[in-house]
Design a protein with these regions (language model features):
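Residues that define the loop-to-transmembrane-helix transition and helix capping
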Residues: 41, 69, 97, 126-127, ...
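Acidic active-site catalytic centers that drive phospho-/nucleotidyl reactions
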Residues: 82-85, 103, 107
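A feature for the membrane-embedded catalytic helix bundles of lipid/isoprenoid biosynthetic enzymes
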Residues: 2-34, 104-227
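Membrane-interface helix starts
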Residues: 36-46
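Alpha-helical transmembrane segments of multi-pass integral membrane proteins
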Residues: 16, 43, 74-75, 103
Length: 227
C-alpha cells in the first residue's frame, strides 16, 4: 500500500455499544445474503426511498395517525440500509467518496424532512420542531470535519440507531395519544413535544461536545505542527 493510501485511511470510531451490536447482527443475518451484483449506492437508494415513503406517511398522518406505521417502517428500512451500504462497500472493496457523500446527504435529508413532516401533521409544535431541525445536520457536518482534518469517522454517542429509535418511540406515542394536549404552567404541550425536548437536550449536548472537542484537537495539532 502506498503512503498516500495510508494517509487517506479513515479510522472509524463507534462509542455506542448498541450501534456496534446492531451492526454485527445485521451483517451476520442480512449482510451475507446481499446479492453480489448489488452496489452500496443501490442499498443507500433503497434506504432513501424507504425514508421518503416514511416522510410522506408522516405528512398524511394528519388525517389518520395510523399512517405513522408507514413512517416507522420507513425508519427501519432507512436504518438497516444505512448500516448495510457501508458493510457492502468495505467487504467488497467498493468504497468511494461519492458513495459516502450520497449516504450522508440522504441521512440529513431524511431526518430533517421527517421533523418538518411531523410538525406539519400537528404531532409536534413548530416552536419546538424548529430547534431540532438543524441538530442532526450539524452533528453530521461536525463528523465530516473529523474525517477531513483528523482522518477519524467519529460516530456521536447518540448515533443513527438511537436517533431512529427516538423517532420510532415518538411515532408510537403519537399514534396512542394522537394530538392530545396537556397544559403545563399555561403552555400547551403534546406527547411529541415532550419526547423532542427530552431527546433534543442530549443531542444538543453531544453536538456541542463534539464541536468543542474538534476545535481543541485542531488547535493542539496546529501547535504541534509549528514546533
Amino acid at each position: 500500500m502506498s503512503d498516500k493510501n495510508k494517509e487517506e485511511k479513515v479510522k472509524k470510531i463507534i462509542p455506542s455499544k448498541l450501534e456496534t451490536g446492531f451492526q454485527q447482527f445485521l451483517y451476520k443475518t442480512i449482510g451475507i445474503h446481499i446479492p453480489e451484483k448489488m452496489t452500496p449506492n443501490q442499498i443507500t437508494l433503497i434506504g432513501a426511498i424507504g425514508g421518503l415513503i416514511g416522510i410522506v406517511c408522516a405528512f398524511i398522518a394528519k388525517f389518520n395517525p395510523l399512517f405513522l406505521i408507514g413512517t416507522i417502517c420507513g425508519l427501519i428500512c432507512h436504518l438497516i440500509c444505512d448500516d448495510l451500504d457501508g458493510y457492502v462497500a468495505r467487504t467488497r472493496n467498493m468504497t468511494s467518496k461519492a458513495g459516502g457523500y450520497f449516504d450522508l446527504l440522504t441521512d440529513i435529508l431524511h431526518i430533517t424532512y421527517l421533523i418538518i413532516a411531523l410538525a406539519f401533521a400537528g404531532f409536534v409544535s413548530f416552536e419546538i420542531a424548529i430547534f431540532l431541525v438543524p441538530v442532526y445536520a450539524l452533528i453530521i457536518f461536525t463528523a465530516m470535519n473529523y474525517v477531513l482534518y483528523l482522518k477519524e469517522f467519529l460516530f456521536p454517542r447518540l448515533g443513527p440507531i438511537e436517533t431512529h429509535l427516538f423517532f420510532i418511540v415518538l411515532c408510537i406515542g403519537s399514534m396512542i395519544f394522537d394530538n392530545a394536549v396537556i397544559t403545563i404552567c399555561g403552555f400547551e404541550i403534546k406527547f411529541a413535544d415532550i419526547v423532542f425536548i427530552l431527546g433534543g437536550i442530549p443531542m444538543y449536548y453531544e453536538m456541542i461536545r463534539l464541536q468543542i472537542q474538534l476545535f481543541k484537537r485542531l488547535k493542539l495539532k496546529e501547535n504541534e505542527d509549528k514546533e
